Amino acid sequence: MTQEKMTSVSSRIVHALCCVLLLAASRHVIGSELPLDKIKLPPGFKISLYADNVPGARSMALSPDGTLFVGTRGKKVYALPNRGKRAGELITLASGLNTPNGVAFRDGALYVAEINRILRFDNVESHLRNPPRPVVVNDSFPTDTHHGWKFIRFGPDGLLYVPVGAPCNICEPDPARYAGIFRMKPDGSALEQYARGVRNSVGFDWNPDTHELWFTDNGRDWLGNNAPPDELNHAPHSGMNFGYPYCHGRAIADSDFGSAHACSEFTPPAMELGPHVAALGMRFYTGKMFPENYRNQIFIAEHGSWNRVPPIGYRITLVRLKSGKAASYEVFAEGWLQGLFAWGRPVDVQAMPDGALLVSDDKAGVIYRIGYGDV
């Protein structure tokens, strides 16, 4: 074995041991025991529990009537009627599904993304406790479970956007099937690829002023503690290529595949995020509760690293825009990570009608509410 390979193996062993210690320390804490006082926020902001028993809470979608739908990476989808600062009773809308991470709401129907298909529950709010049998909208997606869970959302063009992750850490998958963002009509027809070279996006939104797509992307593993960065990308039109698997961040050529293409051939990220932070859900904040300087800025849920020493992420960050371009990257809420102990992992963010910001947490199994002032 060469010295280079021995060093690589040793590095991975150290990473693995640290991960074991982190997981061992990260016991599940029930909602009433969560140390919310550990969460640091800018002055004037407050965090509380919106729902304290939502096992595996992941992606969120809000209906115009205020019902919050929550996907999971287990087998269930939940519904939470809005009761103001606290959610109503947790309702199990569906069970027995295949990793129903993604949820989206349109015209009275809930769309749910499994690994390889999109389902639709029609007239769902009239039948939360006894929903109709779902309609299979599209079942043509790959069955790979590696990066197979999906975030979905309807764009301003009325189309449903669906990412398909790379089925690996680093490889050259079929570019027509993997590592991209796709879109289709609400009935599942006219499926087409919108963006390429996207390793694993689990969150996107559209700028409310320009209606252009922005999305997060998770960087590859095993290039070191500080490389590559996760990414916030801007895709104002279809057909753009963001570099995976050849290039990471603005100019990091991949150690396995980078010789095939120069980084200059691809669209660079709008903002490089922290390395291995696992940037997932993101939203442009359009509410009126927060101070004006937060309006139309991007909140990002960073789920947290699994193989970095020391751990990083486990927080909500804010990317500020200036003249339509990403200008700064800062921490908004942190404290879920205490040393090597992570008691919570943010997944998605969702603004409520009153302007409060909800944050889902699949580790603690809760949904937080971040408000400003006494509201």
Please describe what each predicted stretch is.
Residues 48-73, 278-284, 300:
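Beta-strand-rich domains and repeat architectures in extracellular enzymes and scaffolds
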Residues 67-71, 109-112, 159-163, 212-216, ...:
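Conserved beta-propeller blade signature
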Residues 72-73, 115-117, 123, 165-167, ...:
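Short loop/turn segments immediately following the C-termini of beta-strands
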Residues 56, 89, 96-99, 106, ...:
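Beta-rich catalytic cores
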Residues 49-54, 91-96, 137-144, 193-197, ...:
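Surface loop/turn motifs at the tips and blade-to-blade linkers of beta-strand repeat domains
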Residues 116-155, 163-166, 195:
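Asp-box/WD-like beta-propeller blade repeats and closely related beta-sheet repeat scaffolds
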Residues 30-41, 149, 166-169, 183-189, ...:
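Beta-propeller domain segments
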